[in-house]
């Protein structure tokens, strides 16, 4: 996929990576991909860790409120985590609600968010999506956030 952002449109953007570390090894792989993509783009970033995917949208909201009160302002956000289907309905709730909340934040607050929360059937699928040499969803989410930063600037939002 080609991303619609040139270096000029997003000159040194500063992003917040919010990572859920429910599965530490998978979180490391996703974070590695996101950092590599942001480094390659010349972006700067902070990283904050939360317990699970449902806590990611709230953390982004906290960061937005903090910026309104003199804290760090971020140009965009990268959400990283893994939700693996289990034997209960919990997978559906976490998958649907984390995605819905990120979409709501993005639209209602006009912010750039790259969604790198994996929702998979098993650990094998998670690894295929997390590893940089495979699908590199961490890198994809970071590049998506950069693209959205560029589009927001292009439209003057």
Curated annotation (Swiss-Prot):
Residues holding (2S)-2-hydroxy-3-oxobutyl phosphate: 87-88, 129
Pathway terms, separated by semicolons: Cofactor biosynthesis; riboflavin biosynthesis; riboflavin from 2-hydroxy-3-oxobutyl phosphate and 5-amino-6-(D-ribitylamino)uracil: step 1/2
Family matches, as InterPro entries: LS, LS/RS, LS/RS_sf
NCBIfam families referenced in this protein's UniProt entry, alphabetically: lumazine-synth, PRK00061.2-2
Similarity-based family: Belongs to the DMRL synthase family.
Stored PANTHER family: 6,7-DIMETHYL-8-RIBITYLLUMAZINE SYNTHASE, 6,7-DIMETHYL-8-RIBITYLLUMAZINE SYNTHASE DMRL SYNTHASE LUMAZINE SYNTHASE
Name listed for the protein in its UniProt record: 6,7-dimethyl-8-ribityllumazine synthase 1
UniProt organism field: Brucella abortus (strain 2308)
Induction (free text): The two ribH genes may be differentially expressed during the Brucella infection cycle. Brucella would use RibH1 for flavin biosynthesis during the extracellular phase and RibH2 during intracellular growth.
Residues annotated for 5-amino-6-(D-ribitylamino)uracil binding in this entry: 22, 53-55, 82-84, 115
One Pfam family here: DMRL_synthase
A GO biological-process term: riboflavin biosynthetic process
Protein EC: 2.5.1.78
SUBUNIT field: Homopentamer.
Active site: 90 (proton donor)
GO cellular-component term (any): riboflavin synthase complex
Top EC class for this record: transferase
Reaction(s) catalysed (UniProt annotation): (2S)-2-hydroxy-3-oxobutyl phosphate + 5-amino-6-(D-ribitylamino)uracil = 6,7-dimethyl-8-(1-D-ribityl)lumazine + phosphate + 2 H2O + H(+)
HAMAP family xref list: Lumazine_synth
One GO molecular-function entry: 6,7-dimethyl-8-ribityllumazine synthase activity
Function: Catalyzes the formation of 6,7-dimethyl-8-ribityllumazine by condensation of 5-amino-6-(D-ribitylamino)uracil with 3,4-dihydroxy-2-butanone 4-phosphate. This is the penultimate step in the biosynthesis of riboflavin.
Traits of the deletion mutant: Cells lacking this gene are not auxotrophic for riboflavin and grow at wild-type rates in both rich and minimal media. But simultaneous disruption of ribH1 and ribH2 is lethal.
Keywords per UniProt: Riboflavin biosynthesis, Transferase
